[in-house]
Design a protein with these regions (language model features):
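Short, low-complexity, intrinsically disordered N-terminal modules
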Residues: 5-8, 25
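Bacterial N-terminal signal peptides
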Residues: 14-24
């Protein structure tokens, strides 16, 4: 297969958006796997509770983290399959959500920033909730499901997709109305992209996510006698890291540590991976640990709100016919490589939590190490619920075989993309410069190219280098592996 050798100007027109103009026959058609799963209640359809967290990585008890406490997600996983190697298609909220809610990669949606609406490029796309709506389901959104800027869009619809829903709710709490009280350890950055936190007095119910969870519980109660698709979009643990003080108290400062970063960590890797410039934003270690504590507090606070949802399903008698999907939108660095937040093509920024609980199917705790994509959520849910008129050009795969057997044979590789452009925080790039990173993750390796290799590349062997410290790109010993991974990457792009 010939390499992609477009120059960067052509890439802006071709690589980023070529899939928007391509013939639909050239787009990878989903492999439909017929589902023989039915709800426990005869003729009634499955309900769906779709839970999305914002900026959540896999540092959680439910993913075997020894520190971060998630008792309600721990309970959920007892009758679910958790995917330990699930990856987003873009490590940034807007592009990622547009991708998994439409079932198309960012190359196809054309969403590579926080300003573009996928409808601008795909006006006829049928989103996941919209398909449920067309199949007679009650569809509703609470909070952030499609993209919304945080904190500025809290209490507003943001970049919501109105035709996907029957009802929508935009909760707002003191995490927004009193955000002027947050402690910002990176004061040159606005709170939505800063390391900042606030431990509040008072109850959970004063906060946006608790208000939203209460609304979602009410919606479940009111619509329990009809098939529903209810999406609860939590704003936490996105910055500012705000939660009641009791959740901060779960994490004594002596438990909060930072990952070690070798002095030569950035010597042999493309500079375009670096989102945090300078390293750790020049913030002292104690302040970084305080911010990380706030992130953990936000996770435990969010988990408590999930507990309300699970309890309501049980109390209303619909738990045994409701599929629950829990996921994040992208990963999150907490000091890995001296970096914070998302917007990089590393493991911590592309790996996302994903849990599927399906009554009658995932009755026991299951854990899958197979590599899956967020794109797989759409075709999996649509087939589990036997929906009609599923788009035939979805780019994900049906996860049913892994829900039936988490260790089943699976030819999976995850594709992610990131467009790096200069801004007032990215000081190493020239005005007008663009760097397009594309990566593929297999069970053992990650292979990344920046501008088709013109601006460098990366190859990591996680079997011997789980922390991505040794870039093997163009290493003669890995020549064959690199070529195979490059071909896998290009096949993903062509689809």
């Amino acid at each position: 297969m010939r390499p992609f050798n477009f120059n960067i100007q052509k890439k802006a027109q071709v690589i980023l958006f070529s899939m928007l103009m391509c013939n639909h026959g050239n787009v990878f058609a989903q492999e439909k796997v017929a589902s023989n799963v039915t709800s426990n209640d005869g003729n009634k359809k499955y309900n769906v509770l779709f839970i999305v967290a914002d900026d959540l990585n896999c540092d959680m008890g439910c993913f075997d983290d020894p520190i971060v406490k998630t008792p309600n997600l721990d309970k959920l996983r007892q009758h679910a399959v958790r995917f330990n190697n699930s990856y987003c298609q873009y490590p940034f909220s807007g592009p990622s959500r547009a991708s998994f809610l439409t079932g198309y990669t960012p190359d196809r949606t054309g969403v590579l920033d926080l300003k573009t609406n996928f409808r601008d490029n795909l006006p006829a796309a049928v989103t996941l909730p919209e398909l449920y709506k067309k199949n007679g389901y009650y569809t509703a959104r609470v909070g952030k499901v499609f993209h919304a800027n945080v904190p500025n869009d809290i209490g507003k619809p943001g970049m919501d997709d109105p035709q996907s829903w029957i009802d929508t709710y935009n909760p707002i709490g003191i995490d927004r109305t009193e955000e002027d009280k947050v402690i910002n350890v990176t004061p040159d950055r606005p709170v939505g992209s800063a390391l900042c936190y606030m431990a509040t007095d008072g109850s959970d119910d004063e906060h946006t996510d608790a208000i939203g969870a209460n609304i979602a519980c009410t919606m479940i109660k009111k619509n329990k006698n009809k098939p529903f698709f209810i999406a609860m979009g939590f704003y936490r643990p996105h910055s500012p890291y705000v939660a009641p003080k009791k959740y901060f108290d779960l994490y004594p400062m002596d438990q909060i540590t930072l990952p070690e970063v070798p002095e030569d960590d950035w010597v042999n890797r493309p500079i375009y991976e670096r989102f945090t410039d300078p390293i750790n934003w020049g913030v002292e270690e104690t302040k970084l640990r305080e911010a990380k504590r706030g992130y953990y507090a936000g996770i435990s606070f969010m988990d408590a709100q999930i507990g309300k949802l699970l309890k309501t399903l049980e109390e209303e008698g619909v738990a045994d016919k409701t599929i629950i999907v829990f996921c994040g939108d992208n990963g999150y660095n907490l000091g890995q490589h001296g970096m914070w937040k998302k917007q990089a093509l590393f493991e911590h920024t592309t790996r996302t939590p994903l849990i599927f609980s399906v009554p009658g199917l995932t009755n026991n705790e299951g854990k899958s190490s197979r590599v899956v994509e967020m794109l797989d959520i759409y075709p999996t849910l649509a087939n589990l619920c036997n929906l009609k008129n599923i788009p035939q050009d979805l780019q994900g795969k049906n996860l049913l075989p892994l829900l039936q057997n988490p260790d089943a044979a699976w030819d999976g590789a995850a594709y992610s993309v990131l467009l790096r452009t200069p801004n007032r925080f990215i000081k190493y790039m020239k005005k007008g410069e663009r760097a397009l990173g594309r990566t593929i993750r297999t069970e053992r390796y990650r292979y990344t190219e920046w501008n088709d290799g013109e601006k460098g590349g990366e190859l990591y062997d996680y079997q011997v280098d789980p922390n991505e410290n040794d870039n093997l790109y163009n290493n003669p010993k890995y020549k064959k592996i690199q070529k195979e991974l490059q071909e896998k990457l290009y096949r993903k792009i062509e689809k």
